[in-house]
Amino acid sequence: MKKIVFTGGGTVGHVTLNLLLMPKFIEDGWEVHYIGDKRGIEHQEILKSGLDVTFHSIATGKLRRYFSWQNMLDVFKVCWGIVQSLFIMLRLRPQTLFSKGGFVSVPPVIAARVSGVPVFIHESDLSMGLANKIAYKFATKMYSTFEQASSLSKVEHVGAVTKVSDQKNPEPDELVDIQSHFNHKLPTVLFVGGSAGARVFNQLVTDHKKELTERYNIINLTGDSSLNELSQNLFRVDYVTDLYQPLMELADIVVTRGGANTIFELLAIAKLHVIVPLGREASRGDQLENAAYFVKKGYAEDLQESDLTLDSLEEKLSHLLSHKEDYQAKMKASKELKSLADFYQLLKKDLS
């Protein structure tokens, strides 16, 4: 039986594509393994999925671009993670390793290359994260969502592989209940803050609940179960799975962070959106780049977190609603998306 090892973690964005690809390989008779951190979100998501995947936990250390005494300890963790991954590779003898990035992926990528296992990696953002910059040196091939520099000879630009589609599905019973609390004459605004929610969105909704629910139906994915609420024109929930796409479809506008996975999901269904990217003080600046790219393409509006107020947000919402056809036409004309089936066929071809 052929074997494939997946790796990637730290955030949902570094796990999502793996979760979409693994069932395809399982259906085709592959034995699927995953290397990650048992305390990480990658382990939680695989357990939730119920997929027949063997999980191998390794030591991980965070890759920092700045000086920290923790870097000294983390160097040892990364080295130990490489040793652990090498033993896993030598024991399994897989045909290939697929990495979605994140600091947990570096040891398995290095170990795979050392043990002669072909390495395929995927980069979602406009600029490579530090983990993938390291991984690229050991990779057989990298697939990218955005165009990359021509000097990166191992990169193939494939566009975004998204987990949502424009196919309409039957409404879940829970969605019917949510809609019964909404005023159908008002536009519906969905706040999406990534896998852990976004404190700034949660605070805005909390501080301006009265004003917002007078003018909009509000859906707030919070990442915090203490905020859960279903009331007149308001639905707040910590986390959703099956409801994710139905809520996307229900919304007239989405207010989101600038993670590549989410904004390309919105592009795939031509959904109006305002991007509030994480700034450089909280990230490496990838979300700022993603947001600027989407604004330049005419797909979205952006708003810096430091400028986010009720008034500034409503100005953006009003602009999007009044120019809905223009934004949707540009999104529908985009050539930057690839279906999961097409990407899987491309990957299988490269593995053969």
From Swiss-Prot:
- SUPFAM superfamilies, alphabetically? UDP-Glycosyltransferase/glycogen phosphorylase
| A single cellular component GO annotation | plasma membrane
Q: Does the keyword Cell wall biogenesis/degradation apply?
A: yes
Q: Which GO terms describe its biological process?
A: carbohydrate metabolic process; cell division; cell wall organization; lipid glycosylation; peptidoglycan biosynthetic process; regulation of cell shape
GO MF: undecaprenyldiphospho-muramoylpentapeptide beta-N-acetylglucosaminyltransferase activity
Q: Which residues form the signal peptide?
A: none
Please give, as recorded in its UniProt entry, the membrane topology of this protein.
Answer: Peripheral membrane protein
Which pathway does it serve?
Cell wall biogenesis; peptidoglycan biosynthesis
State the superkingdom: Bacteria
Q: What class of enzyme is it?
A: transferase
Instruction: Identify one Pfam family in the record.
Output: Glyco_transf_28
- Reactions this protein catalyses: Mur2Ac(oyl-L-Ala-gamma-D-Glu-L-Lys-D-Ala-D-Ala)-di-trans,octa-cis-undecaprenyl diphosphate + UDP-N-acetyl-alpha-D-glucosamine = beta-D-GlcNAc-(1->4)-Mur2Ac(oyl-L-Ala-gamma-D-Glu-L-Lys-D-Ala-D-Ala)-di-trans,octa-cis-undecaprenyl diphosphate + UDP + H(+)
* EC number assigned by the record: 2.4.1.227
Protein localization = Cell membrane
**Keyword Lipoprotein among record annotations:** no
Q: Which UniProt keywords apply?
A: Cell cycle, Cell division, Cell membrane, Cell shape, Cell wall biogenesis/degradation, Glycosyltransferase, Membrane, Peptidoglycan synthesis, Transferase
Q: Which residues bind UDP-N-acetyl-alpha-D-glucosamine?
A: 195, 287
Q: Which family does it belong to?
A: Belongs to the glycosyltransferase 28 family. MurG subfamily.
Stored PANTHER family: UDP-N-ACETYLGLUCOSAMINE--N-ACETYLMURAMYL-(PENTAPEPTIDE) PYROPHOSPHORYL-UNDECAPRENOL N-ACETYLGLUCOSAMINE TRANSFERASE, UDP-N-ACETYLGLUCOSAMINE--N-ACETYLMURAMYL-(PENTAPEPTIDE) PYROPHOSPHORYL-UNDECAPRENOL N-ACETYLGLUCOSAMINE TRANSFERASE 1
Purpose of the protein:
Cell wall formation. Catalyzes the transfer of a GlcNAc subunit on undecaprenyl-pyrophosphoryl-MurNAc-pentapeptide (lipid intermediate I) to form undecaprenyl-pyrophosphoryl-MurNAc-(pentapeptide)GlcNAc (lipid intermediate II).
Q: What is this protein called?
A: UDP-N-acetylglucosamine--N-acetylmuramyl-(pentapeptide) pyrophosphoryl-undecaprenol N-acetylglucosamine transferase
Q: Which organism is it from?
A: Streptococcus pneumoniae serotype 19F (strain G54)
Q: List the top taxonomic levels of the source.
A: Bacteria, Bacillati, Bacillota, Bacilli, Lactobacillales
